[in-house]
Design a protein with these regions (language model features):
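N-terminal targeting leaders of exported, membrane, and organelle-targeted proteins
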Residues: 1-66, 70, 146-163
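Solvent-exposed aromatic/hydrophobic patches embedded in short alpha-helical segments
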Residues: 45-47, 76, 119
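Loop/turn elements at helix/coil->beta-strand transitions in domains of secreted/extracellular proteins
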Residues: 51, 105, 138-141
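A local structural micro-motif
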Residues: 57-59, 83, 103, 141
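Short, surface-exposed glycine/acidic/tryptophan-bearing loops
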Residues: 66-114, 133-135
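Disulfide-stabilized extracellular recognition modules
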Residues: 111-163
Length: 163
């Protein structure tokens, strides 16, 4: 579900006290496609890959986007990387809580990549993530993106659904 960021060297003068906690994640509002957000670009690039695979385009879905955005923000705020939320939530339970009508969802998560293009490339290079992107049964997509001060700094979520 994503690799580690490039290794870095330790600071020349290590701090003598604990660093302050990471700032809260910034969570841009869930905007519909066409608004020029990173989420919009992930949707566009996902549909490019689906077209190459012979699948129809995914439609933007506000409920799936709310679920994906909340999960990305939670990972960024709480400095973890998992399909299971800190409260035990799953992709399906998050989607249903956000208003998706059934639990049939797929999810891709990524961390550390700084652009939509790099994130899509990571997913396309992973067979399990690629399978979600080119699963022609899916009809709708929600995308979440958040930045935080944690280990990976950039957290991405795709929530796929079928109606």
């Amino acid at each position: 579900s994503g690799g580690s960021p490039a290794p870095t060297t330790p600071p020349a003068n290590p701090p003598t006290q604990n660093p302050p906690p990471p700032p809260p994640a910034t969570t841009p509002p869930a905007n519909p496609p066409g608004s020029g957000t990173p989420q919009d670009e992930v949707l566009r690039l996902t549909n490019v890959e689906r077209q190459r695979a012979g699948c129809g385009p995914l439609a933007f879905d506000a409920s799936l986007t709310a679920a994906a955005q909340a999960h990305s923000a939670d990972m960024a705020t709480n400095n973890y990387f998992s399909h299971t939320g800190q409260n035990g939530s799953t992709a399906g339970s998050r989607a249903q809580a956000a208003g998706w009508p059934n639990g049939y969802v797929g999810e891709n998560i990524a961390a550390g990549s700084t652009t939509p293009a790099a994130t899509i490339q990571m997913w396309m290079n992973s067979s399990g993530h690629r399978a979600n992107i080119v699963n022609c049964a899916y009809t709708h997509l929600g995308v979440g993106y958040a930045q935080g001060g944690g280990t990976y700094r950039h957290y991405w979520t795709q929530a796929f659904g079928r109606r």
